[in-house]
């Protein structure tokens, strides 16, 4: 008999679940005060050394009863099992409508007993606020503190106070950006986040997989605007696909071929296009290539009022105010011939993978994770366990219906929607892009079918539309998986008509995303149906199927013209379905590989980031940095002495610009240029004299320490911002080199290490410069204002 680890784990967790349920009757007899005092009792046990595991059964039984008394809802056995699974650091796959929100109360309460640092993370600000308000009542009733970490009306929140709560409901981006901004403060007391103890991620596949390649980036420090975007755009538009450049299998990456590079060198009249000399120009060519051939209008972005607006890949919503980093946004603007926006530097960056790996404990919930179980385990060490449903799932999932062309598919889709509309059966119709949702909407209107279109809505309005999508006669057109996290409840009389009909108009790049769509129907034992109507010219097929499929499709079209095949007839047999399935598998594999590369690249940045952030904290906590500053000066003057040996002009220029503005070279003895030690000694003497002048203004040890801390911190931040920005630019370039000739991760690591060494020198230089050349302005009350050069 084969051993099944998942079943073993579920049996283990089921035993714990039964013990929790067994306490149910006992806890029902407790008065409110007796139940609420349990929080203090459990906390006292933790103080005395008890583990969370040892108090889990009692804690879960307590909060389960509290859920009923405050919300009128008592978690079912499957929800309690899901909650146990979550506590032990797993992903719980729970179908739509199985009550993930209530399930989360148990692990959050248990971990909340330890104090601040526990988070329910979602992608949706509206849901985070809603659940913090509604579900938060339970925690507060039980004596814990709970708050929302997001604002819906741009109200300024006191994040430091919010993160002192035992439990915080927030979004992945809000939490990640707060972590990054914490590492830009100049005083340790200004940090908002103190502890990253437990993160329970709702829709975990969306956060940790679908959004994994999009790093959180804080931008600032404007760059000097480049004039190369327009010229490189024109050059790239003249190149030939598959000759001068070629695509990855999923068409999501593109790079120049050797032929293309040679053509460009000949056209530009240069040699060594990919050498350091032409690196900036080459980077702009790469950006123009991506903008023109990878980024698609009305799929990745829209142009409105002569402005490029990004689109949310999850729901098609326009992301006002957000821009792509590393110059790609400006390259798209050049492509679309609109005014170029200001280009900014990346000041801080982290991917969601590496951010959530920082938590002591991580778990997640979703309706669709099993198909990505291997990736969850390999990348996050998160096993995926499927939780049984409370009621049997009776949804009917039909096999795909495949058509030769999109036109045939659209007509069949409209016929199916019309048939459901006539009997007032609700339909959820999912499209793959904003432009396609508009197309289907227009066709439905032409047939007199009243419907809602779910794209670019506010999150609150989106939730309302989704919630009503199960009502009699409701037809809802949605882009991708808009409205996740909101249940579709069936209206009166809908069960008798077969429940919600879910129609997918194309296969997405991942089977998991299609499973999410199917999961919208058949909640909590309700009837429902799902079906995908697909065609051989759908995006996933065009981008991932072999070349012969296009010839096969053209042959089918010709058969219609010759009267050998009936127009609109679905393709019979498994061959057509296999084409679509294999194309989707290829897309899914390519996306997984791309995510793995993104993890590897960010791991390289993570090592540097952790070193810098730990060093930053050390600087802010230190009361005396004199020894460190002296060591920095020593290392830097050593390097300068070696670099400027036998070059009086460069040495004197360095002194005036970095050590003493007022330096006079009357006493300069050219003989010192023969010895590195003599140059270093000479630099140290000038630095001592200059520091003596500064000490006359900062005339006590406290002020000197303050200046040292400010100078070192400022120098570190300037150097690190330069490094982060360099690595963002570097990532763009190395991922666009032909994969046959280069390993992008290896190239990135090699160049990132070299860049880090350059960053250290910049840090040394600026520390010395800020210490010696800052203008110190005494105040009337004995204070000193520092103005850095």
Curated annotation (Swiss-Prot):
SUPFAM superfamilies in UniProt: Helical scaffold and wing domains of SecA, P-loop containing nucleoside triphosphate hydrolases, Pre-protein crosslinking domain of SecA
Principal EC category: translocase
SMART domains according to UniProt: SecA_DEAD, SecA_PP_bind
Record keyword DNA-binding present: no
Residues involved in ATP binding: 79, 97-101, 487
Pfam families, sorted: P-loop_SecA (PF21090), SecA_DEAD (PF07517), SecA_PP_bind (PF01043), SecA_SW (PF07516)
Catalysed reactions, semicolon-separated: ATP + H2O + cellular proteinSide 1 = ADP + phosphate + cellular proteinSide 2
Gene Ontology molecular function: any one: ATP binding
GO process terms (BP): intracellular protein transmembrane transport; protein import; protein targeting; protein transport by the Sec complex
Keywords: ATP-binding, Cell membrane, Cytoplasm, Membrane, Nucleotide-binding, Protein transport, Translocase, Translocation, Transport
Main location: membrane
Membrane topology: Peripheral membrane protein
Transmembrane segments: none
The UniProt record lists the keyword Membrane: yes
Subcellular location: Cell membrane; Cytoplasm
InterPro entries documented for this protein: Helicase_ATP-bd, Helicase_C-like, P-loop_NTPase, SecA, SecA2, SecA_DEAD, SecA_motor_DEAD, SecA_preprotein_X-link_dom
EC number of this enzyme: 7.4.2.8
GO cellular component, one term: cell envelope Sec protein transport complex
Family per similarity comment: Belongs to the SecA family.
NCBIfam families on file: PRK09200.1, secA2
Quaternary structure and partners: Monomer and homodimer. Part of the essential Sec protein translocation apparatus which comprises SecA, SecYEG and auxiliary proteins SecDF. Other proteins may also be involved.
Chain's role: Part of the Sec protein translocase complex. Interacts with the SecYEG preprotein conducting channel. Has a central role in coupling the hydrolysis of ATP to the transfer of proteins into and across the cell membrane, serving as an ATP-driven molecular motor driving the stepwise translocation of polypeptide chains across the membrane.
Protein name as annotated: Protein translocase subunit SecA 2
Organism: Pediococcus pentosaceus (strain ATCC 25745 / CCUG 21536 / LMG 10740 / 183-1w)
């Amino acid at each position: 008999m084969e051993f099944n680890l998942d079943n073993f784990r579920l049996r283990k967790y089921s035993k714990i679940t039964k013990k929790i349920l067994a306490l149910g009757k006992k806890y029902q007899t407790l008065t409110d005060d007796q139940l609420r005092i349990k929080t203090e009792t459990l906390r006292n046990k933790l103080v005395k050394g008890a583990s969370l595991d040892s108090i889990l059964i009692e804690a879960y039984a307590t909060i389960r009863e509290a859920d009923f008394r405050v919300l009128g809802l008592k978690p079912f056995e499957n929800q309690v099992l899901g909650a146990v699974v979550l506590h032990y650091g797993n992903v719980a796959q729970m179908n739509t409508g199985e009550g993930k929100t209530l399930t989360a109360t148990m692990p959050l309460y248990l971990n909340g007993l330890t104090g601040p640092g526990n988070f329910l993370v979602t992608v949706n600000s509206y849901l985070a606020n809603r659940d913090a308000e509604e579900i938060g009542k339970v925690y507060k009733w039980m004596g814990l503190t709970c708050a929302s970490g997001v604002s819906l009306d741009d109200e300024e929140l006191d994040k430091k106070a919010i993160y002192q709560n035992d439990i915080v409901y927030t979004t992945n981006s809000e939490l990640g950006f707060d972590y990054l901004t914490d590492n830009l403060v100049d005083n340790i007391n200004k940090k908002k986040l103190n502890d990253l103890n437990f993160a329970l991620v709702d829709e975990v596949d969306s956060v940790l997989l679908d959004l994994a390649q999009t790093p959180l980036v804080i931008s600032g420090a404007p760059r000097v605007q480049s004039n190369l975007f327009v010229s490189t755009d024109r050059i790239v538009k003249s190149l030939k696909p598959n000759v001068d450049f070629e695509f990855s299998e999923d068409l999501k990456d593109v790079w120049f071929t050797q032929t293309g590079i040679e053509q460009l060198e000949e056209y530009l009249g240069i040699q060594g296009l990919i050498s350091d000399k032409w690196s900036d120009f080459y980077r702009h060519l790469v950006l123009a290539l991506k903008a023109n051939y990878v980024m698609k209008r009305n799929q990745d972005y829209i142009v409105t009022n002569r402005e490029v607006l990004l689109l949310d890949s999850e729901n098609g919503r326009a992301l006002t105010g957000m821009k792509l980093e590393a110059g790609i946004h400006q390259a798209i603007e050049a492509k679309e011939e609109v005014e170029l926006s200001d280009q900014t530097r990346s000041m801080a960056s982290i991917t969601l993978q590496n951010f959530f790996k920082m938590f002591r404990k991580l778990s997640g919930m979703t309706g669709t994770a099993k198909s990505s179980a291997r990736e969850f385990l390999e990348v996050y060490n998160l096993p995926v366990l499927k939780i049984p449903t409370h009621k049997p799932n009776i949804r009917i999932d039909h096999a795909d219906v495949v058509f030769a062309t999109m036109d045939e598919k659209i007509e069949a889709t409209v016929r199916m929607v019309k048939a459901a509309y006539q009997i007032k059966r609700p339909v959820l119709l999912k499209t793959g892009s904003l432009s396609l949702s508009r197309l289907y909407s227009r066709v439905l209107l032409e047939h007199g079918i009243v419907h809602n279109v779910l794209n670019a809505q506010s999150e609150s309005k989106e939730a309302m539309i989704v919630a009503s999508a199960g009502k009699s006669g409701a037809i809802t057109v949605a882009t991708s998986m808009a409205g996740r996290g909101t249940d579709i409840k069936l209206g009166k009389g809908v069960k008798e008509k077969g429940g919600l009909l879910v129609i997918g108009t194309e296969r997405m790049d991942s089977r998991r995303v299609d499973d999410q769509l199917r999961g919208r129907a058949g909640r909590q034992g309700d009837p429902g149906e799902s079906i995908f109507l697909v065609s051989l010219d759908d995006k996933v097929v065009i981008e991932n199927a072999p070349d012969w499929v296009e010839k096969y499709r053209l042959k089918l079209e010709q058969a219609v013209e010759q009267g050998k095949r009936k127009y609109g007839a679905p393709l019979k047999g498994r061959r057509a379905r296999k084409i679509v399935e294999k194309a989707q598998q290829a897309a899914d594999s390519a996306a997984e590989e791309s995510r793995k590369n993104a993890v590897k690249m960010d791991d390289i940045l993570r090592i540097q980031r952790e070193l810098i952030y730990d060093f930053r904290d050390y600087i802010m906590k230190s009361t005396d940095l004199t020894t460190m500053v002296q060591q920095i000066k020593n290392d830097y003057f050593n390097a300068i002495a070696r670099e400027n040996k036998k070059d009086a002009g460069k040495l004197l220029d360095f002194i005036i610009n970095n050590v003493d503005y007022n330096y006079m070279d009357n006493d300069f003895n050219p003989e010192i240029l023969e010895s590195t030690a003599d140059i270093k000694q000479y630099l140290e003497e000038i630095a001592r004299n200059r520091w003596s002048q500064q000490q006359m203004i900062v005339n006590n040890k406290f002020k000197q320490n303050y200046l040292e801390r400010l100078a070192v911190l400022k120098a570190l931040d300037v150097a690190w911002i330069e490094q982060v920005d360099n690595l963002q630019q570097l990532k763009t370039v190395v991922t666009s080199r032909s994969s046959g000739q280069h390993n992008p991760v290896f190239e990135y690591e090699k160049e990132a290490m070299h860049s880090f060494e350059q960053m250290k020198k910049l840090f040394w230089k600026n520390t010395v410069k800020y210490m010696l050349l800052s203008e110190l302005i005494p105040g009337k009350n004995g204070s000193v204002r520092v103005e850095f050069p």
